[in-house]
A protein has these predicted regions:
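Alpha-helical transmembrane segments and their helix-helix packing motifs
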Residues: 4-189
Length: 189
């Protein structure tokens, strides 16, 4: 949140780019069975920078949801902390753990990551507000120590499509897991 509020005050050099429509159907993530999926029309008439902003947000949310889904399953089956006594639904267990000591550190980690993403935005001074620079590839953190990123553009697009689709599924899955636990009051696994 801090990075979103400070983006306008910490913007890069002013640019004067004209807003041009961009065809989002060419991006990774367009695949069978849904094809291009934008039911609310966010990308209709949007510029390339704005579409990249939406894609960046989708990737971040998808990555967090993939980790949350895994953490949900592991957390309900493995209880090494706090004496292993908290075998409760996640919504209740979260309130029973002494997380107040962890929250400032966790908030700091999120703030550092979000602060670093400020430099991916176009400047709001003369540029388009809430859009990503044209030289930045959405989701590319510039860190691939194991060399998983394919060199071939077709293979890269295929891998990006898999990540987008897995992230979309994970976002739906974590909402379903939390919803089911809240509705039944019991653990899932």
């Amino acid at each position: 949140m801090l990075s979103l509020c400070s983006t306008s005050s910490l913007g890069m050099v002013a640019t004067t780019t004209a807003t041009q429509k961009f065809d989002a159907r060419r991006l990774a993530g367009v695949s069978y069975p849904l094809g291009f999926f934008d039911p609310l029309g966010f990308t209709k008439g949007a510029s390339k920078g704005k579409v990249k902003f939406y894609r960046e947000a989708e990737l971040k949310h998808g990555r967090v949801a993939m980790l949350a889904s895994l953490g949900f399953v592991v957390g309900e089956n493995f209880h090494p902390m706090w004496g292993g006594e908290l075998d409760l639904p996640s919504a209740i267990a979260f309130q029973e753990t002494p997380l107040q000591d962890w929250m400032p550190g966790l908030a700091l980690l999120f703030a550092i990551h979000e602060f670093s993403s400020i430099w991916t935005f176009n400047s709001p001074f003369g540029g388009e507000l809430w859009s990503i620079r044209s030289d930045y590839a959405s989701g590319d953190l510039g860190w691939d120590p194991l060399g998983f990123k394919p060199k071939d553009p077709a293979a890269l697009k295929e891998m990006q499509t898999k990540e987008i689709n897995n992230g979309r599924l994970a976002m739906i899955a974590i909402v379903g897991m939390v919803g089911q636990e809240l509705a039944t009051g019991q653990t899932l696994f």
